[in-house]
Amino acid sequence: MTSRRVVPDIAPRELTMATQVMNHVRDRIHSGDMRPDTWYSVYQLSEELGISRSPVRDGLLRLEEAGIIEFVRNRGFRVVEPNPSDVADIFSIRLSLEPAAAARAATHAGPGDIGKLRELLAHMAAAIERQDEATFFDWDQQLHDALASLGHSHRSRAILATLRTHTRLLTDSTVRKYRSLEQVYSEHLPIVDAIATHDAPAAAAAMRAHVSATGRLLLAQNLRKAHPEWDAPELDRRVDEIWERHTAHL
């Protein structure tokens, strides 16, 4: 155990234009305003947002990297139908990395690190009071990044940051219909508590429970959207089947 602080300083994040483009397109996709059967152009989107084409293209390229859209030469871009297996695949990778990172954080965290984690939780709680979902999940992202940084693996931290971004882009929020901000917040408390007491197995177990809960909810949401004709038992069976196929080895 060390007392050296390794959690990055906490600071509000300003969204780049490319990120704003990503969020705008994501919101339009999830609202049904952008559909897979329609072609769109960078020029039209640039005009709509009132910004130059360069940041629009940057944001769209990141969405293409995440599998949200695809560019076709001389046609523009279109929305890609989400694949439930993509969601399960992302979470299988997260499950292979994040519990181990939480366990390492419990070993390495010093008093200053734990204080920063508590501060991030306080920011999340304040966002709940305001019912500010966007800010809540920004602090949530920072908390997960802080935990990954305590794991002393820069490569894992970078991979996880990319996967969490892909998760937010590929799926809609689970909060609106399936769980509250308070429930999401409560899943983080045992993770930080275990790190504060340097209980590595408990930290890993709490992180596994949190990531699994989120992954299964997002998978169910994705399947429900693709197959509205399925009843609840059929949906649960399909979720179990896909989840088991992707995570049984972990």
Segment roles from a protein language model:
Residues 180-250:
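C-terminal regulatory/effector modules of DNA-binding transcriptional regulators
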Residues 65-70, 163-165, 179-182:
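Mobile beta-alpha loop/short-helix "lid" or hinge segments that flank ligand
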Residues 106-107, 152, 176-177:
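Short helix-capping/hinge motifs at transmembrane helix termini and TM-loop junctions
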Residues 1-107, 220-250:
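Short linear motifs at protein or domain termini
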Residues 83-84, 170-174:
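Short alpha-helical transmembrane interface motifs in multi-pass membrane proteins
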Residues 90, 111-172, 185-194, 202-213:
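Conserved amphipathic alpha-helical segments that form helical-bundle/coiled-coil interaction surfaces
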